[in-house]
């Protein structure tokens, strides 16, 4: 999703691969996968971001990045 990242590709690829493997292990359909991932994002924001305004700003940036990654090039 991100065009630039402060994380190494190796670290990102390993984490992404693990998350995908878990969804595949549970044979999670698309809707269940999206629900689980959405809950993870919500929990990450609630547990790690101090203020409601910061959480909303990050959620907006995240949703914009997601939408931009889906645009046909």
From Swiss-Prot:
Domain of life: Bacteria
Coiled-coil intervals: none
Cited Pfam families: DUF1414 (PF07208)
UniProt family annotation: Belongs to the UPF0352 family.
HAMAP family the record matches: UPF0352
NCBIfam families registered for this protein in UniProt: PRK13689.1
Designated name of the protein: UPF0352 protein APL_0584
Source species of the chain: Actinobacillus pleuropneumoniae serotype 5b (strain L20)
């Amino acid at each position: 999703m991100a065009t630039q990242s402060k994380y190494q590709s190796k670290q990102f690829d390993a984490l992404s691969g693990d998350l995908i493997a878990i969804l595949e292990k549970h044979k999670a359909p698309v809707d269940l996968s999206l629900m689980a991932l959405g809950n993870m994002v919500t929990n990450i924001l609630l547990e790690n971001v101090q203020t409601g305004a910061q959480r909303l700003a990050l959620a907006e940036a995240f949703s914009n990045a997601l939408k931009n990654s889906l645009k046909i090039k």
